[in-house]
Amino acid sequence: MQLRDSLRRTKIVATIGPATSSPEMLKAIIEAGATTLRLNFSHGTHADHQRSIRLIRQTAFELNQPVAILQDLQGPKIRLGRFENGSIVLAKGDRFILTNRQVVGTQDISCITYEYLAEEVPTGAKILLDDGRVEMVVEEINREKGDLCCCVTVGGKLSNNKGVNFPGVYLSIKAMTDKDREDLMFGLDQGVDWVALSFVRNPQDLIEIKELISSTGKQVPVIAKIEKHEAIEQMEAVLALCDGVMVARGDLGVELPAEDVPILQKRLISTANRLGIPIITATQMLDSMVSNPRPTRAEVSDVANAILDGTDAVMLSNETAVGNFPVEAVATMARIAERIEQEERNSATRQLRDSRRSIPNAISQAVGQIAENLGAAAIMTLTQTGATARNVSKFRPHTPILAVTPHVNVARQLQLVWGVKPLLVLGLPSTGQTFQAAINVAQEHKLLFEGDLVVMTAGTLQGVSGSTDLIKVEVVTAILGQGIGLGQGSVSGRARVAHTGLDVSNFNPGDILVAPRTSADFVEAIRKASGIITEEESLTCHAAVIGLRLGVPVIVGVKKATQVIRDGAILTLDVQRGLVYSGAVGTP
């Protein structure tokens, strides 16, 4: 039962930056627990990001582990212009003008990167600058000049390009800028796995980006970053359209009272869980680790509470992008997650009940309950798009989920989904064959062992998304050997280990012949056999030639077969893959 105890359910998103741009650091943070790597398109050039993408893909290949790449678009962040001396200091009571005119900033005025400033911001509106460090109120508006004449209510320092927020004011600004469109096309061309849209306000913003992605022929899922009050007011409609959510607590805490953010975080997580879409909790989770090797106790509690709330993933920003301890930050987050999850399993915490009636929902919920009742080592899902795995995940089963898919992009995307370990397995003609191949891969990766119980779920209509309607329980059997298969399909039977023709004098019809090599003395036994296993490797050996002539499946080149396989044991031969299993394994 090693898998159930060791697999961390909560995923970790790490932001790539100067501190983690080398191959050695990328490898280290992935090995420490990062499952998705975020590229922040507010910084860096396309050449920088292209280099990062290539390094991530190469490192993931070397580690034999799917790693998702999340492209985070900058969005229409409203900012100040540049000051003639780089910065100014404002005091409470100072008068200050914000204008849409292109002027160089002084002690009295600064331009702002929004054209319709004077038309849409009313008198009396509160304006927050530099994440709320400076605050002012609009006293007068000059629409002809495009000026907002303000009074400073909270003083402080302002410098070039600092952000500006208008809490409670409805602006007609679009969620995607021209830069975002260029960045999106670049990201799609580079094969990113997720795209995060910043400053989402309404469902139309999501429709726009999805239509853009669709027009390129791609199917990249979109994450809605919730950081505007308008998005909160239309939460259900926004979340129903996106493929994932990010609780962007930085700007959200400026747009809304800071004390509201924890409540909104819980609401967003609960809604995303119910809808079965992954949710990331982000911003300042381990912020002190930018410069310190250990987090504060409050930060540990913040990460822990997000996990207890039900977040799929927790995110590191500056901690891994520019921090002094990026690997330690990832490892710390992984340790917190493992400890909290251990406590959750021990205390049998609540599991989601989805009131929407559907066959996939009922199957997905039942799979978790069956796995827990039977003490299964894993739940195994066959999925073409990731939908089956996500559906099982939303019910938060205590048993780990192995998501079997033939598509590498789906495997990467599932690295953002709670409790899911993706396995890349080539699609085979039948569901049973694909499950058996997946069990083999899981055994090779030490995720499953002989005797483990696995609860399987899939759709009987292979390749059709959303058709989950099958539950199957199976015991993992050992792979006794591997060689080269000659023939078709799979056969099961009782092993008859023979070193000479005399050893098969009482050979029964349907038995499987196991021998170092065969000769003319074995022909009568071969006529009765359902299969042949030999240690001899040649494809033109006696067993291979006679087996093909008589239509008997053969696996040649199975090393030490006569030593490993016990006489009288039940075996299954998977001829297509050249595998010999212990026990009768169904591969319909």
Language-model region placement:
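Structural preference for beta-strand elements that scaffold enzyme active sites
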Residues: 11-13, 36-38, 66-70, 95, ...
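Phosphate-interacting basic helix/loop segments used at nucleotide- and nucleic-acid interfaces
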Residues: 47-50, 55-63, 67, 107-135, ...
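ATP-dependent carboxylate/acyl-activation modules
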Residues: 94-95, 236, 269-273, 280, ...
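Acidic, glycine-rich flexible loop/linker segments
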Residues: 76-177, 441, 447-502, 506, ...
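Conserved glycine-bearing catalytic or ligand-binding loops at nucleotide- and phosphate-handling centers
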Residues: 32-88, 188-193, 313-336, 340, ...
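Short, ordered loop/turn segments at secondary-structure junctions
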Residues: 16-18, 34, 41-44, 73-76, ...
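Conserved alpha/beta-domain cores
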Residues: 6, 14-18, 169-283, 289-300, ...
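Expand to "…catalyze enediolate/carbanion chemistry for C-C bond making/breaking, isomerization
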Residues: 1-18, 22-23, 30, 45-50, ...
